[in-house]
Amino acid sequence: MKAEVVSMTADNLDMEAIRRGGDILKQGGLVAFPTETVYGLGGDALNPQASMKIYAAKGRPSDNPLIVHIAEFDKLAPIVAEVPEKAKILAEKYWPGPLTMILPKSDLVPQETTGGLDSVAVRFPSDRIAQELIKAAGGYVAAPSANTSGRPSPTTAQHVEEDLGEAIEMIIDGGQVGIGLESTIVDFTEDVPVVLRPGYISLEMLQETLGDVRMDKGLIAADSKVRPKAPGMKYRHYAPKADLAIVEGPEEAVVKKINELAAEAKAHGEQVGIIATDETKDRYPEGLVVSIGSRKEEETIAHHLYEVLRDFDQSAVRSIYSEAFYTPRMGQAIMNRLLKAAGHKIIQV
């Protein structure tokens, strides 16, 4: 089976293709679609078999919960047991948008969708294509990122086709996504809201809105018997095919160390990949150097991260060295993804 690829934009929707995509989802099939964060792999969230198909297509462990996407505020109440007041405040401020909330689930949501948990992760995306597809599918679409599990998340339809083109029925090509990192996930099943995955909406923004919000300290669960409460917590994610390491420290020391590593590799007849910035890219004479953007524009760094990791897969490099990107607002989200991609391999200088 080869996926049908249909192209459209938010300003020029192909409603006939969206209707067909909705029918595929209603019948238990899978459709990949754009959101403002990354491309999602959609299945009917209320159909246990569809959720299991998502896990199979991605090669994803079935205890890794799926996010249920809605496109209307009144679709939230039927799938949750309750909505805490603080969750209502966040929904009013950030929905539709890159925010996922974990809430106690209702009996309407099958355990297959929630990874066996009694809670459900819910998001209302702002992308118009996503919204119309969700409505056409009946209102509830479970959708993790549309990539093979463990690989960098897809920011273009081409990325989806590379990973899942033979495993799903349809890919809706809406162009390159806007943000490029997955949504912020906030858990409301505890007394104090807890950020389980950082994203575009930062911890500081959440604290300004709600007051006491905490960052989960164990974003990767060490115990394989512990069920992750949110996508991305337990398993290695976002990884390129080459080994990736992050070089941390003062800029001068980082540049010097990466150049030493590149020279050493060259002496052995190998070329390394280097993830640099606009400010440092010309300081690396050896290696395949890619700039992720300027440190002055953190949204650009976030936007290009997965694209850069995937681009290295088209090269012959076996090792990649990246600078660290502790930027003011999105630094937590960027470094969360980069550290997971590197398997937490850090070289301190």
Where are these regions (language model features)?
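Active-site-adjacent structural elements in enzyme catalytic cores
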Residues: 1-349
